[in-house]
């Protein structure tokens, strides 16, 4: 059958920039998926997606002009229902055949075959292939239904009465199969070979496409458009680096901003702008955020990462004289920077300490009170954690940092740029003469804010960050605001993971259960429901997920966490020990034996003794196991006590032979109650020795 490459383009009004990348990818993927399902293209066909501010497109290789005919087997009904005793068609069968467009003459061609329950009648036929025109129309509508459109527009078509819903009005439709247009109509448009280039700089309008493969090249040469999103993005990166390098500077790295400006321009032109040096007195985070969020500029940093007074503009036009474009952008950014400077100057007229009382007027949650009440709770938790980790000195600093941590929420700068909460608190605290470790703790108490984010830089910050997250978790769980499914409006999963990361990566010698108890004690009695266990288990789930993401298997993680370790900062070392143990030749047999021991002890009636009496042993195998335990247990315990979990587990390898012999030669559930109790006590000793680092029975297949 004839194949050729297919090009499809929707020419639209300006698409939402933050959604463009996903729209382009989703359009091409859904279009291809539908064509594959209809048999018009192979599942492995190469696909290129195009997305620019005014177009969505896809280029798909080796698309059929018509899909192949397909043999179809249709089950009709059981033979007993379709044929009478003489083998003639029943009315039920004739009615079913008529519904399929056949008559009584088809009865002789029906096939008999078992359907697994009874013998049934099947009709074999051939489904004619679908033309590309029909298939593409179906694929287009299906793909448009699947687009992740943030907000749909309703607009009227040119006929004056038809209304359609789409992300933006569609003004052109291209569908080329090789050199031939595909007969498709949608949005009141007939597909053709004409498209449009850059709004201002196209050399030709319209652009008449020669064939499907010429699309990208013709758009760039005749239309001044780089249609491929990835290529346009790469060109922006190249130009940014080329503009910054001669100055010895580097543009701020921001992947989201890069995607957004790629979605705002069709052919990028990077230009250099600058502002007055005086604005650099304002914290650079404020200036950078202002330029990125409001103007979509790329601020330039020096080799030390310090902001300079220069920035890069990604323009959509390339005039012979760019001074007007640069000058216009410099004029626009100046008031923005002036506002930031004004906010900074005004905010410093009032200390953070003086703002704290104002938090009593800010509602945090209608069931949990004000931000002022919350600050008091966070202070109490931070003090307690500080006392545990560093004594009175750390507790006092943690208390001060917790008191001031939320005060910057009442500043003009944070009111304008909420993203700067914490950051501005640090600057204002330093201006007020607060010690640096306390000031940095104010900024850092929000960390980690996202996966892979840095942790607090000093112990004071760690105390306040833990306190802030624990107070949030306990408070919201206590009033029933738990995450459900993919809904987590208060980012409680992120908070819990932050606590887990700090405990592990900062090697903090404090138990998770103790931290949860400290946090609950900070709340007024009767304010919260009984949610201690829920919070604890929720955080353990985050710990389990974090360890699996680091490459540990579910069995390895389960083996360690099933013992509910008090110190989760030791969990990674214990997991490494479990992994090393699992590699031993004796591991599988010992894991299976441990599982068997656990099952025996669970079924045992009454209380099982903690240790066996060697004087009651009858069999040589139980004496040998007791002797082996007497030799191995102290070594394993000593290694465990010194933190050498690998050695503690590996010491168990010596138990394989005596354990195997014990189960081969000894009847645990002996008729003599005293003998049975002694053997159960021996197994209890074995179980405790084997399960000190991890429950190795979880490693059993």
From Swiss-Prot:
Q: Where in the cell is it found?
A: Cytoplasm
Signal peptide annotation: none
Q: Name one GO cellular component term.
A: cytosol
**Keywords of this protein's UniProt record, alphabetized?**
Aminoacyl-tRNA synthetase, ATP-binding, Cytoplasm, Ligase, Nucleotide-binding, Protein biosynthesis
Give the Enzyme Commission number. Answer: 6.1.1.14
Single GO molecular function:
ATP binding
User: According to the lineage, what is the superkingdom?
Assistant: Bacteria
Respond yes or no to whether keyword ATP-binding is given for this record. yes
Which reactions are catalysed by this chain?
tRNA(Gly) + glycine + ATP = glycyl-tRNA(Gly) + AMP + diphosphate
Subunit details: Tetramer of two alpha and two beta subunits.
Q: Indicate the family of this protein.
A: Belongs to the class-II aminoacyl-tRNA synthetase family.
Q: What is the name of the protein in this document?
A: Glycine--tRNA ligase beta subunit
Q: What is the lineage of its organism?
A: Bacteria, Pseudomonadati, Pseudomonadota, Betaproteobacteria, Nitrosomonadales
């Amino acid at each position: 059958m004839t194949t050729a490459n297919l090009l499809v383009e929707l020419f639209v009004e300006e698409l939402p920039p933050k959604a463009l990348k996903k729209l382009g990818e989703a359009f091409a993927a859904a279009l291809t998926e539908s064509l594959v399902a209809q048999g018009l293209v192979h599942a492995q066909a190469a696909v290129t997606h195009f997305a620019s501010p005014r177009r969505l497109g896809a280029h798909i290789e080796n698309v059929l002009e018509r899909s192949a005919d397909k043999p179809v087997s249709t089950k009709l009904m059981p033979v007993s229902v379709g044929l009478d005793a003489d083998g003639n068609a029943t009315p039920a069968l004739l009615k079913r055949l008529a519904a399929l467009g056949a008559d009584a003459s088809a009865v002789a061609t029906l096939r008999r075959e078992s359907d697994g329950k009874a013998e049934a009648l099947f009709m074999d036929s051939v489904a004619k292939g679908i033309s590309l025109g029909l298939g593409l129309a179906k694929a287009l509508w299906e793909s448009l239904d699947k687009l992740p459109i943030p907000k749909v527009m309703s607009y009227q078509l040119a006929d004056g009465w038809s209304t359609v819903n789409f992300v933006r009005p569609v003004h052109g439709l291209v569908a080329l199969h090789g050199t031939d247009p595909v007969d498709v109509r949608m949005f009141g448009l007939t597909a053709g070979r004409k498209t449009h280039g850059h709004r201002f700089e196209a050399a030709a309008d319209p652009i008449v496409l020669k064939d499907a493969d010429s699309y990208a090249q013709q758009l760039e040469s005749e239309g001044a458009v780089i249609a491929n999103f990835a290529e346009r993005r790469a060109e922006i990166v190249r130009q940014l680096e080329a503009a910054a390098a001669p100055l010895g500077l580097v543009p701020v790295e921001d992947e989201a901003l890069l995607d957004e400006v790629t979605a705002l321009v069709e052919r990028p032109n990077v230009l250099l702008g600058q502002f007055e040096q005086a604005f650099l007195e304002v914290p650079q985070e404020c200036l950078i955020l202002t330029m990125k969020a409001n103007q979509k500029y790329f601020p330039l940093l020096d080799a030390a990462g310090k902001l300079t007074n220069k920035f890069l503009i990604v323009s959509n036009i390339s005039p012979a004289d760019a001074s007007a474009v640069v000058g216009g952008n410099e004029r626009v950014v100046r008031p923005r920077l002036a506002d930031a400077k004004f906010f900074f100057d005004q905010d410093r007229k009032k200390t953070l300490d003086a703002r704290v009382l104002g938090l009593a007027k800010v509602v945090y949650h209608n069931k949990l009170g004000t931000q002022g009440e919350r600050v008091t709770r966070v202070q109490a938790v931070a003090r307690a954690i500080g006392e545990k980790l560093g004594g009175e000195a750390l507790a006092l600093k943690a208390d001060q940092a917790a008191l001031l941590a939320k005060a910057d929420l009442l500043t003009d700068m944070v009111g304008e740029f909420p993203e700067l909460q914490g950051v501005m608190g640090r600057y204002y605290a330093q201006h007020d003469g607060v010690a640096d470790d306390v000031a940095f703790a104010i900024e850092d108490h929000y960390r980690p804010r996202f996966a892979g984010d840095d942790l607090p830089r000093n112990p004071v910050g760690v105390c306040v960050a833990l306190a802030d997250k624990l107070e949030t978790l306990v408070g919201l769980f206590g009033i029933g605001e738990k995450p459900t499914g993919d809904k987590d409006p208060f980012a409680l999963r992120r908070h819990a993971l932050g606590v887990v990361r700090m405990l592990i990566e900062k090697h903090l010698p404090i138990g998770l259960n103790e931290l949860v108890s400290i946090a609950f004690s900070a709340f007024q009695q009767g304010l919260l429901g009984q949610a201690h266990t829920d919070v604890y288990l929720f955080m353990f789930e985050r710990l389990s997920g974090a360890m699996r993401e680091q490459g540990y298997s579910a069995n390895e993680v389960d083996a360690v966490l099933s013992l509910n370790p008090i110190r989760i900062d030791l969990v990674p070392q214990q997991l490494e020990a479990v992994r090393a143990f699992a590699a031993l030749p004796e591991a599988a047999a010992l894991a299976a034996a441990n599982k068997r021991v656990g099952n025996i002890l669970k079924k045992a009636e009454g209380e099982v003794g903690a240790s066996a009496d060697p004087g009651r042993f009858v069999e040589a195998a139980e004496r040998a196991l007791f002797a082996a335990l007497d030799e191995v247990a102290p070594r394993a315990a000593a290694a465990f006590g010194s933190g050498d979990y690998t050695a503690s587990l590996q010491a168990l390898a010596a138990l394989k032979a005596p354990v195997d012999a014990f189960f081969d030669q000894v009847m645990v559930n002996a008729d003599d109650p005293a003998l049975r109790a002694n053997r159960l006590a021996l197994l209890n000793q074995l179980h405790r020795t084997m399960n000190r680092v991890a429950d190795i029975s979880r490693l059993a297949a």
